[in-house]
A protein has these predicted regions:
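Conserved catalytic cores of very large enzyme subunits
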Residues: 1-336
């Protein structure tokens, strides 16, 4: 195991392309502001996909988002191509190479791509997955289907960070959310995953890179959130995005098994252009208390295994513990922060 969620093969894994962290919540914000982001004012930082208020259907919103998503991935691939080229020219790891069988046999350094017999890996991170999925779900449900909100009202609410718009925020927070075994939202999540993998499969080799889709942010969803304004899932401006393939903070209301099922339903098992998917789940102490609780936990892990999911990390915490940790972090250093 390498890091938190990756499996590695000794003496087979060789070149691993430095990964790109892509803020897909930025792609969503570019849809709302026609290629702009609130933090950067009038600067055009993405594609100009049209005025949000002019979209007449959810399909048009989704099409605009996917254009922004593909544009970010494409630029990440171009960047990775240059990194790969420069890395082999300027970096070397003599000690690590001397310990690797294939490097010794081929007289090549680990930083060189295409070592005979080796497995070349690379990946890009989807940061803000559930934030984007939940936001698109809320737009689809509340604006285009139930018509409880107008596009103008949504833009005004997020543009003002929901100050004076708490009623709208509550509507958004109670829209269908990923992590609740709700096919309405999970189908959107599966589509975003599919489109990312299809793009990777088609264009990765053309651009000279091997890049798989990965959802392991470590803690990057926190600083990435600091450049993203309020989002249509009810998230406040510049607060953390969702982490990994986990549900948005506080959005998983139907229990931990529902989170597993959403994670399963959003994966595209037929595609191979995917890597690790980090999944964090919180359990209350009462859920795992005593022999009965231990048995429940065992069955939960078995369910995760049977669903062929990649990674599972559960933290046994209650709300009061987390609040105390915020006040006195030095007393809670053993809490896992991934």
């Amino acid at each position: 195991v390498s890091g938190c969620a990756e499996c590695r093969m000794p003496n087979r894994d060789t070149y691993t392309s430095p990964n790109a962290y892509i803020n897909f919540a930025a792609a969503l914000e570019m849809v709302l502001y026609n290629g702009k982001m609130k933090k950067y004012g009038d600067e055009i930082v993405g594609l100009e996909t049209g005025n949000f208020e002019d979209f007449e259907s959810f399909d048009e919103v989704l099409e605009a988002y996917l254009k922004q998503q593909k544009n970010l991935i494409r630029h990440a691939f171009i960047q990775q191509h240059e990194i790969i080229r420069l890395r082999g020219e300027h970096f070397a790891t003599p000690l690590g190479s001397s310990l690797h069988k294939l490097c010794r046999e081929s007289y090549k350094d680990l930083h060189q791509p295409s070592i005979p017999g080796g497995i070349d890996l690379g990946y890009f991170e989807f940061i803000g997955y559930a934030t984007v999925v939940d936001s698109l779900s809320a737009i689809k449900k509340l604006i285009f289907e139930e018509k409880r909100l107008t596009k103008k009202e949504l833009l005004e609410a997020v543009n003002n960070d929901f100050k004076g718009y708490e009623a709208i925020r509550q509507l958004l927070l109670h829209a269908p959310s990923y992590g609740n075994d709700d096919s309405y939202t999970d189908e959107i999540g599966q589509l975003l995953d599919l489109e990312a993998q299809k793009f990777t499969h088609k264009y990765g080799k053309e651009l000279g890179v091997h890049m798989d889709l990965r959802l392991v942010p470590f803690t990057s969803h926190v600083p990435f959130g600091k450049v993203i304004g309020a989002t249509p899932n009810g998230r406040f401006s510049y607060t953390p995005l969702s982490d990994g393939s986990s549900a948005s903070q506080g959005a998983d209301l139907n229990g931990p098994t529902a989170v597993l099922l959403s994670n399963y339903k959003t994966k595209n098992f037929d595609y191979e252009d995917h890597a690790a998917r980090l999944l964090n789940i919180k359990l209350s102490p009462s859920c795992v208390e005593g022999e009965n609780g231990t048995e429940k936990l065992v069955q939960f892990i078995k369910a995760w295994h049977d669903l062929r999911l990649w990674h599972l990390q559960f933290n046994v915490l209650n709300t009061e513990t987390l609040r105390q940790a915020q006040k006195q972090p030095q007393l809670y250093l053993s809490l896992i922060h991934i």
